[in-house]
Amino acid sequence: MNSATLICQDKYAAQKLANLIFVNDTKETYVTEILNVVENEVVLSIKDKSAHSVVLEDNDQVLLFTDFIQSVIEKKQKIVQTETVGSSVVIVKE
């Protein structure tokens, strides 16, 4: 398994990111595409075709997230767990 810890702008952004990318009850990944990146903000498209933005701490966190989530978007890997701790999100994929 592979994991990444991302630091968001605040606790709210961390909870939003965790809920947008993965739903624990159904084990589904909702993110289908990264639509745009503007500085430390990532705009994501989810399964229902809606767009949502999440603000991460800095550009390094954006690079970490976009690199980590790419294999999930390409359906090469699946997210199996997300956990928020303060303004951080731990994402685990297999």
Give the positions of each predicted feature:
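Short glycine-enriched loop/turn motifs at secondary-structure junctions
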Residues: 1-2, 48
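Negatively charged, low-complexity tracts enriched in Asp/Glu with abundant Ser/Thr
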Residues: 2-19
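Extended, low-complexity, intrinsically disordered tandem-repeat tracts enriched
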Residues: 10, 58, 91-92
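Periodically patterned hydrophobic/aromatic "hotspot" residues that form packing/interaction faces
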Residues: 17, 42, 62, 89-90
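Short acidic DE-rich linear segments
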Residues: 84-94
